[in-house]
Amino acid sequence: MSENSLTITEILSSIRTLLVKHNKAKVTQIEKELLQAVAELEKKFKQQVQNFNELQQKIPNLQKVNEEFRLKVEKIQEEAQKKIQEKVAELTIKSKEELENAKKYVIEKSIDQPLIIIDQFEIALSYAQKDPQVKNYTTGFNMVLDAFSRWLEGFGVTKIAIEPGAQFDEKVMAALEVVPSDQPANTVVKVSKSGYKLHDKVIRFASVVVSQGNKTE
């Protein structure tokens, strides 16, 4: 029995001596309740001691868990930082590529008018072959057309080379008309308007007349 229990027992003995003459049953009840309270306190105290001992045993394990957790957190931080750096590098490269493409194709929106001028010179040259009065101007027309074409080439604009007899290619051609012809089906009979590329991008499809083949076949 602990010191606290002995002290309470002595108190109970004194109380019993003082009150035994007045109410023996009441004293017995009080004594019983106090003894129960003491027993409960002792039980709780022993439980707390046991809990404390168990906690002391767990401390090394807790330290190990904390160290493992710290290492995991550091690993996650390193991986996150690596992914962020990769994403930044990717966005930087993408931004540079987009900027280069923007520079590369900036002329696209304003190229229509120069191409119309070239079309007019090409039409004039085609008529010049038939009209002797205009034929005298072909040399000058060709010089201007060549100079203008070279100027456009400086911006990356080039004519798509298509000749009659070529196979129709929907990637660079648009069929204005399909006509009977001695040439094989799906063959270019005539180039009505030249097509152009800006670097590797088709900015205007060539307008062509396409053969449907010989009707007698």
From Swiss-Prot:
Key word Chaperone present: yes
Protein's cellular compartments: Cytoplasm
Alphabetical keyword list: Chaperone, Cytoplasm, Stress response
Pfam family, one: GrpE
Function: Participates actively in the response to hyperosmotic and heat shock by preventing the aggregation of stress-denatured proteins, in association with DnaK and GrpE. It is the nucleotide exchange factor for DnaK and may function as a thermosensor. Unfolded proteins bind initially to DnaJ; upon interaction with the DnaJ-bound protein, DnaK hydrolyzes its bound ATP, resulting in the formation of a stable complex. GrpE releases ADP from DnaK; ATP binding to DnaK triggers the release of the substrate protein, thus completing the reaction cycle.
Family to which this protein belongs: Belongs to the GrpE family.
Name assigned to this protein: Protein GrpE
Source organism of the structure: Mycoplasma pneumoniae (strain ATCC 29342 / M129 / Subtype 1)
